Amino acid sequence: MPYHEFEVSKCIPERREHAVMKAAGEDLTSCLPKGYLNTIPGTISERGCAYCGAKHVIGTPMKDVIHISHGPNGCTYDTWQTKRYISDNDNFQLKYTFATDVKEKHVVFGAEGLLKKSMHEAFDAFPNIKRMTVYQTCTTALIGDDVDAIAKEVMEERGDVDVFVCNSPGFAGPSQSGGHHKINIAWLNQKVGTVEPDYLGEHVINYVGEYNIQGDQEVMIDYFNRMGIQVLSTFTGNGSYDSLRMMHRAHLNVLECARSAEYICDELRARYGIPRLDIDGFGFEPLANSLRKVALFFGIEDKAEAIIAEEYAKWKPQLDWYKERLKGKKVCLWPGGSKLWHWAHAIEEEMGLKVVSVYTKFGHQGDMEKGVSRCGEGALAIDDPNELESVEAIEMLKPDIIFTGKRPGEFVKKHGVPYLNAHAYHNGPYKGFEGWVRFARDIYNAIYSPMRQLAALDISAPDAAITSGFRTAKMNADLTVSDEVKFSEVLHEYTGKYDSIAEIRARNQPMPPSRKLRDAVQPAAE
């Protein structure tokens, strides 16, 4: 068993089984680290809690909803505005967050009255918003507040509102992944099947496990619209509360992030017979194959092929321009969950990068299995790393860039390594054909930034300003390519706009052919 023991964690021997170095000819039965277990006492984990997984990851991207946390303000603040899940309703869910602000007296005497008062105040403050999600936290779960009963009372008193209750306190799982499961099943049990659509087209999908980071969802919806597919709901990025209550009427669940949303897909299949189809919106070849799979399900392959041909012709020469300049650069792929396997093979094959490490903070064994299988010999795989282990890995592997979250990204920069935000992006969207070129552009800019040269200078030297001029990114990158590539008339840099989403929103999408209207919809299966 090729376990990798970090020097900094020798005092915690249990950590040894949570990191492996992939050896030559290794099969997955002998090179997987342990995963999705409780954090070992003594190691400072970078994980979030189950409440965070429910509210921050899945709940809050819903756009037309008052999201209120029943607990202390700290829980609310920690899950506010750290992910860029934009929406087409002026980003209401990003601008405003709500909390009941539970204090010591409420812990002693109960906080149900406070919750009810806060819910009414929130609805009064935003009279145009008629939907609300209430999130239970550790504090109010431990004192036994009956949030479901309070939600029912508020709905009865106001008449025109609807409230969803998410009971996912922080202790409900070993990481945020526990919260993913909680909110998936709670939404299905409480809300799916409670609203019927006015309109159903010939080809209808739910787009599941997509959170519209900097517009990812809107890019993918544009492809589906161009194929003549009606997207009934998106779970949950840029999705509306009531459309998600109609999920039972789709013909197909198209699943993007399996780690956070496979649970609701599997239950929709079991309860309503809706098939599940896993796709990948990152990378040219994975995305092209994903569009083909969806098209094949509906028998509209020609429409998918037309889109793929158009997008390849426009964006592939630009991707290849960056690939020539990124070949051989080493990357540590340290995101949260499924991106470690969504990205690992695509960035190697399509950008020329070499993945030297993958890690996950809340991924399960299945995520590691897929991630490690897509890495080459010598890749270091780590489950639930702490900061000191990450630093030791950086010193050992010497990556040129790291893809990770904002918190680890800050200490990564202190070690002289550039990072790109794998959770919320730098200049996204990164999904779609153009998005993948934007990602390559951001990698290129980060690796070849003159700031890296300046950061390495000893500015205390008296002649530093004279002897240490710096080169531009393009000058540095072009040192590594041939003249044929450098002066190619086919390959060229990214030509898209800074905001690639505004144009998508401005398009007039044709309504797909009608299959049946609401009065023809039969009651959902029990």
From Swiss-Prot:
Top-level EC class: oxidoreductase
EC number: 1.18.6.1
Reaction(s) catalysed by this chain's protein: N2 + 8 reduced [2Fe-2S]-[ferredoxin] + 16 ATP + 16 H2O = H2 + 8 oxidized [2Fe-2S]-[ferredoxin] + 2 NH4(+) + 16 ADP + 16 phosphate + 6 H(+)
Source superkingdom: Bacteria
Cofactor annotation remark: Binds 1 [8Fe-7S] cluster per heterodimer.
Region (Disordered): 507-526
Positions with a binding annotation for [8Fe-9S-C-homocitryl] cluster: C257, H423
Gene3D superfamilies in alphabetical order: Nitrogenase molybdenum iron protein domain
CC cofactor: [8Fe-7S] cluster; [8Fe-9S-C-homocitryl] cluster
GO molecular function, one term: iron-sulfur cluster binding
Keywords, alphabetical: ATP-binding, Iron, Iron-sulfur, Metal-binding, Nitrogen fixation, Nucleotide-binding, Oxidoreductase
Subunit structure: Hexamer of two alpha, two beta, and two delta chains.
Family: Belongs to the NifD/NifK/NifE/NifN family.
Protein purpose: This iron-iron protein is part of the nitrogenase complex that catalyzes the key enzymatic reactions in nitrogen fixation. Other nitrogenase complexes utilize a molybdenum-iron protein or a vanadium-iron protein.
Additional record remark: The structure of the 8Fe-9S-C-homocitryl cluster is assumed to be analogous to the 7Fe-Mo-9S-C-homocitryl cluster.
The protein's name: Nitrogenase iron-iron protein alpha chain
Organism of derivation: Rhodobacter capsulatus (Rhodopseudomonas capsulata)
